[in-house]
Amino acid sequence: MEVDPQLRILLKPILEWLDDPRTEEVAINRPGEAFVRQAGAFLKFPLPVSYDDLEDIAILAGALRKQDVGPRNPLCATELPDGERLQICLPPTVPSGTVSLTIRRPSSRVSSLKEVSSRYDAPRWNQWKERKKRHDQHDEAILRYYDNGDLEAFLHACVVGRLTMLLCGPTGSGKTTMSKTLINAIPPQERLITIEDTLELVIPHENHVRLLYSKNGAGLGAVTAEHLLQASLRMRPDRILLGEIRDDAAWAYLSEVVSGHPGSISTIHGANPVQGFKKLFSLVKSSAQGASLEDRTLIDMLATAVDVIVPFRAHGDIYEVGEIWLAADARRRGETIGDLLNQQ
C-alpha cells in the first residue's frame, strides 16, 4: 500500500495514542479535541488540528482504498497505514465545520486459550438457563417504579436502565421536548451518536456526533438513515439516538436496537401507544427490507426493540403524559406488543 507522506505528517498529533498499547479507540468529533478510549472509558484531550487537517486526513485515508471522499461521498470506512480501522463522516452527514473520524486500534497481541479466564469476565458463561430469572428480576425492578406512580423516578429508571423508549403524539404535543429532557438524563460519560434529518435534538454530552441524512435520499451526498446507522456501528457508540421515526428511518430504528444498542429515545406520530405502534409497524413494513418479512417475524423483532411507549398531547400550553405502555407490565398480564395491533 503506497502511503502519501502528507498523511503521516497529518497523523503525527495522534500517534502517541495510536502507539500506546492501552488505546482501544480514538474518536475525533470536531476540530480541536479528541476522545481516547483506554481501560474501557473515553477521556478528552486537546488536539491541535484544524478542520482542513481533518478533511485532508479523510481524503488521503480514503485514497488508500481508492475511495473518493468528499461532499458527494461523505461516508467512508477504510484503514490507516498501520492497520487501524477508520470510519469517516464528512459534511453534509455531519454539521458544517465538523468532521468525525473514529479510529479503532487493533490489538497488537493475540492471547492463548489459557489466558481467556484472566482476560475475559465471564461469570455467566454456562448460565443460559438463568436468563429468564434475570429477565424477570429486571422486569420487577422497573415495575416497582411503574407501580409506585412516581413518573419522574420511572422515566429516570427507564433512561439509566437503557430501556428503548418510543415517544408518540401529534405535532406540538411535547414529545420532542420530552426527548430532550430524557437525553439530558443519560449519564454524561456516555458516547452518543444521533441520526436525524434536521438538527432538532439537544445533546449536552461532550462526546457526541450528530449525523444527518437527506429526506427521500435527495441532495448533495445523499445518504439514508440506514447508511448512517451502518457508519455509527463502527463509531463505538454507547447509544444511538434516532430522532423522529419516519419513512426509511423506521427500518434503521429496528436494526439499531436488534444490533445490540438498546437505550434509544425516539419520537413518532400517533395519538396513543396503540396508534404509535401501528405507525411504527406500518413504516417498517413499508420499507424494502420490512416488506419481505412475515408479519409474525416483524412483530417478534419489534417485541425485542420497544420497551416503553410514552404518549403525549397538549391542552393549550399544557403538555399531558397519557397512559404509558410498558413491555414489562404487558408481560405480567400475558400480553405482547403485537396485541396492540388488535386494539383501537
UniProtKB/Swiss-Prot annotation:
GO BP terms: protein secretion by the type IV secretion system
Alphabetical keyword list: ATP-binding, Crown gall tumor, Cytoplasm, Nucleotide-binding, Phosphoprotein, Plasmid, Transport
Lineage of source species: Bacteria, Pseudomonadati, Pseudomonadota, Alphaproteobacteria, Hyphomicrobiales
Residues the record lists as binding ATP: 169-176
PROSITE patterns, alphabetized: T2SP_E
PANTHER family, per database record: TWITCHING MOTILITY PROTEIN PILT, TYPE IV PILUS RETRACTATION ATPASE PILT
One GO cellular component term: cytoplasm
Subcellular location(s) per record: Cytoplasm
UniProt KW S-adenosyl-L-methionine keyword: no
Membership in a protein family: Belongs to the GSP E family.
Stated name of the protein: Protein VirB11
Designated gene of the protein: virB11
Post-translational modification as stated in the protein's UniProt record: Autophosphorylated.
InterPro entries, alphabetized: P-loop_NTPase, T2SS/T4SS_dom, T4SS_GSP_E_ATPase, VirB11
GO molecular function: ATP binding; ATP hydrolysis activity
UniProt-listed Gene3D superfamilies: 3.30.450.90, P-loop containing nucleotide triphosphate hydrolases (3.40.50.300)
Function text: Required for the transfer of T-DNA to plants. Couples energy, by means of ATP hydrolysis, to T-DNA transport.
